[in-house]
Amino acid sequence: MKSDRIKTVDLKSDMPPVAEALLRLDREIALARQQKLTLLKLVHGYGSKGVGGDIKIAVQARLQEFIREGQIRGCVYGENWSTSDELTWKLLQSNPALKQDEHLGRQNRGITIVWL
C-alpha cells in the first residue's frame, strides 16, 4: 500500500436519512478512488443513545458488502482502531503518519476507517 493521507468524511453532520447517508458513502468512495486515495475515515456517529445508530449500522453493512464484492480492501471499526488490531497495525506500518490520528486507540464507535 502506498503511503497516503487519510480523508475524513462526515456522513451524519446534518442527520440525513439512512438512504442519503449511503448515497454520500458511495459518492465519497468513488471520489476517493478518482483522487487516488487509499484511506477514508468515515464519521457516522453511533446513535444518540450510544447503542448504535441507524446510519452506523447501515454504513458498516454496506462496507461489508463492498469487502465481499472486492470494492474495498477492508475496514476497521472505530472501537477496533488501535495498535492491537491486526489490520490497523498493517495500515500503521505502511503509513506511519496514521500513528498521529486523534482517534487511534480511543475506541470511538462513531467512526470507521476504510481501506480502498
Language-model segments: which ranges?
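Long, charged, low-complexity intrinsically disordered regions
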Residues: 1-116
